[in-house]
From Swiss-Prot:
Keywords: Chaperone, Cytoplasm, GTP-binding, Nickel insertion, Nucleotide-binding. GO terms for cellular component: cytoplasm. This is Urease accessory protein UreG. Pfam families: cobW. It is found in: Cytoplasm.
Length: 204
């Protein structure tokens, strides 16, 4: 059991696959770790409801936060609403190992406050085009792990994974990244290995 839970922030643009990744991580890790989730949505609790419907975790382990019009503010400049949700989960489930904090759909400049997140995973998707990595921004360049999702769509949108690979290496300067397809689970094992290694997680 870890003294304080590892908090992993999962960010990225709307539709990139953040919630699908959060669901996949819950299903893969819930037997190994004492786990909970905070989701951020602008005006609803849609992502939290999705996780509950798909039985990611018991409903009481998932808190949906409504951020209002600026989802990036709730994870960066004023993270108090998220920190309160994390505190609530810690009180509800003593001995938590891991809390996933999924941001609302944000732009390429959004980052997590260090107060809120120990590790950050930023999710982009191939359907946004193969030029996306070279556009940079803190999420692409500075996140602890970049996930390039929906690689199955590359042929459909004319995106070059080779170009994305070389651009991402250049933009991230050696920081890790993973190509993934959440529909098939491709890349998930690498993402989990990163979380466990970097977060010093030890299963109960």
């Amino acid at each position: 059991m870890n003294a304080q839970p590892l908090r992993v922030g999962i960010g990225g643009p709307v539709g990139s696959g953040k919630t699908a990744l959060t669901l996949a991580l819950c299903l893969a890790l819930r037997e190994r770790y004492n786990l909970a989730v905070v989701t951020n949505d602008i005006y609803t609790r849609e992502d939290a409801d999705f996780l509950v419907r798909n039985e990611a975790l018991a409903p009481e382990r998932i808190i949906g936060v409504e951020t209002g019009g600026c989802p990036h503010t709730a994870i960066r400049e004023d993270a108090s609403i998220n920190l309160e949700a994390v505190d609530q989960l810690n009180r509800r489930f003593p001995g938590l190992d891991l809390i996933l904090v999924e941001s609302g759909g944000d732009n390429l400049s959004a980052t997590f406050s260090p107060e809120l997140s120990d590790l950050t995973i930023y999710v982009i998707d191939v359907s946004a085009g193969d030029k996306l990595p070279r556009k940079g921004g803190p999420g692409i360049c500075k996140s602890d792990l970049l996930v390039i999702n929906k690689i199955d769509l590359a042929p459909l949108v004319g995106a070059s994974l080779e170009m994305m690979n070389s651009d991402t290496q250049r933009m991230r300067g050696g920081k890790p990244f993973v190509f993934s397809n959440q529909k098939t689970g491709q890349g998930l094992a690498d993402i989990i290995a990163f979380i466990e290694r970097q977060g010093l997680l030890t299963a109960a």
